[in-house]
From Swiss-Prot:
The gene is pheS. The lineage of its organism: Bacteria, Pseudomonadati, Pseudomonadota, Gammaproteobacteria, Enterobacterales. This is Phenylalanine--tRNA ligase alpha subunit. It catalyses: tRNA(Phe) + L-phenylalanine + ATP = L-phenylalanyl-tRNA(Phe) + AMP + diphosphate + H(+). Gene3D superfamilies: Bira Bifunctional Protein, Domain 2. Keywords: Aminoacyl-tRNA synthetase, ATP-binding, Cytoplasm, Ligase, Magnesium, Metal-binding, Nucleotide-binding, Protein biosynthesis. Its EC number is 6.1.1.20.
């Protein structure tokens, strides 16, 4: 079949001259498609004697296979060339720095809580937590707060019903701890508290941390020394600190603690006092044997003083321009 060899030669030439995969596909259809030149060669077999057809068919099939192999090889070459060209256009300089992702930062109130927990942790205090939905006994009664106290009024407290409320202080955590644990006790209780108030210096929800020590021979001197050290550590200054006599139902004697501000004025930072004997009795601790001190402070208040923030509400408005200053 001299004509067959000529067809294969032409097919090879067309394959080599194809400059892209699309042109190569046209060559395949021309020679190997249903009406391709080599495919039609099979129709000539009917003109041959029966005994010659198998050999002739084998020759045609081999020719078709040779052309298919040439097509496959050329296709691989063209695809590699196209890939290399595309990669050359999309060259990446691997020495360039990657895209940086802006790191987040801790909220300033969280920073304050962490800082205080670290300080008192080094003094042996444990961090304890409690429920934010509290009962009136742990929030008021056990803390020696009488039924007529204004803190119980609806305009100050969020009540669910006559017995349940959103806690107004974390002092309930102290009561729950003393109910379960006998002295010595040394804890701090951070957490969210709720009061019905909203203005430049008050929000309905804020963060508070209270501390408690109960042991033998605990005195007001221990309280003063602890808080002196804490405030100087927290503000990183040798601050002037004063204790003013005050009143809290759950401590006796009680005091409010002030620090001298940069403007020469005293700034209130926390309240404290010796645990009231009635509170100890309410949790089954003998006040003739044990004594203790407690203190409480607002985290937002301390954060405002530390960072010079003038509006408490800024902590809850999620303004990134404000929050990024503390990263």
């Amino acid at each position: 079949m001299p004509h067959l060899a000529e067809l294969v030669a032409k097919a090879r030439t067309a394959i080599e001259e194809a400059q892209d995969v699309a042109a190569l596909e046209n060559v395949r259809v021309e020679y190997l498609g249903k009406k391709g030149h080599l495919t039609l060669q099979m129709t000539s077999l009917r003109e041959l004697p029966a005994e010659e057809r198998p050999a002739a068919g084998a020759v045609i099939n081999q020719a078709k296979q040779d052309v298919q192999d040439a097509l496959n090889a050329r296709k691989q070459t063209l695809e590699s060339a196209e890939l290399n060209a595309r990669l050359a256009q999309e060259t990446i300089d691997v020495s360039l720095p990657g895209r940086t992702i802006e790191n987040g930062g801790l909220h300033p109130v969280t920073r304050t809580i962490d800082r205080i927990e670290t300080f008192f942790g080094e003094l042996g205090f444990s961090v304890v937590t409690g429920p934010e939905i509290e009962d009136d006994y742990h929030n008021f009664d056990a803390l020696n707060i009488p039924g007529h106290h204004p803190a119980r009024a609806d305009h100050d407290t969020f009540w669910f019903d006559a017995k349940r409320l959103l806690r107004t202080q974390t002092s309930g955590v102290q009561i729950r701890t003393m109910e379960k644990q006998q002295p010595p006790i040394r804890i701090i209780a951070p957490g969210r508290v709720y009061r019905n108030d909203y203005d430049q210096t008050h929000t309905p929800m804020f963060h508070q941390m209270e501390g408690l020590i109960v042991d033998k021979d605990i005195s007001f001197t221990n309280l003063k020394g602890t808080l002196h050290d804490f405030l100087r550590n927290f503000f990183e200054e040798d601050l002037q600190v004063r204790f003013r006599p005050s009143y809290f139902p759950f401590t006796e004697p009680s005091a409010e603690v002030d620090v001298m501000g940069k403007n020469g004025k005293w700034l209130e930072v926390l309240g404290c006092g010796m645990v009231h004997p009635n509170v100890l009795r309410n949790v089954g601790i003998d006040p003739e044997v044990y004594s203790g001190f407690a203190f409480g402070m607002g985290m937002e208040r301390l954060t405002m003083l530390r960072y010079g923030v003038t509006d408490l509400r800024a902590f809850f408005e999620n303004d990134l321009r404000f929050l990024k200053q503390f990263k």
